[in-house]
A protein has these predicted regions:
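Mature catalytic core of soluble alpha/beta enzymes
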Residues: 1-155
């Protein structure tokens, strides 16, 4: 919608979904650059608040995880992403981040893939043109779809 209204350069964050339209102006006023978006580290006790940053233009960055919306009962933490097979919180990952052109689709994909076994999720993401994913496993290691690293900002 915003593009149809003439917006050519915009970064929008709504409820944790981030959408980049076009590129941003560089500080010296000469040229443009891709937007830099940090991907939050789901491990709250870590000193490192972001896992990595991605460089995007014309894409959305959407994450689903077990670290923001949860509650604790008798010492057990329950998050909001429910496994449709067990009807309990999904136990596969700490976080899934999706890069794609449509923020609504990214939101649906991040939740759906959060509930899939890793290899099934990877195959599904790899079958979708223009879509990449990052998984944060329970032990904190990361796994990416085939083209995700093309967007990662070098440290």
């Amino acid at each position: 919608y915003l593009e149809s209204r003439g917006f050519q350069s915009l970064l929008l964050s709504v409820g944790g979904n981030i959408r980049a339209i076009g590129k941003k102006a560089v500080p010296d006023g000469e040229g443009e650059a891709r937007w830099t978006i940090g991907i939050q580290n789901p491990e709250k006790s870590s000193e490192r608040t972001e896992l990595m940053a991605v460089l995007i233009d014309g894409l959305s960055v959407v994450s689903s995880g077990n670290y923001e919306r949860y509650y604790t009962v008798n010492g057990t933490r329950y998050h909001h992403i429910i496994d449709p097979e067990t009807l309990f919180p999904s136990a596969c990952f700490n976080q899934v981040t999706i890069l794609c052109g449509d923020s609504g689709l990214g939101d649906a994909l991040s939740t759906a893939v959060f509930n899939m076994p890793l290899e099934e999720g990877r195959a599904y993401i790899d079958s979708l043109a223009g879509t990449e994913a990052l998984w944060v496993l329970k032990d904190g290691t990361t796994v990416c779809s085939a083209g995700f690293w093309d967007y990662v900002k070098p440290e």
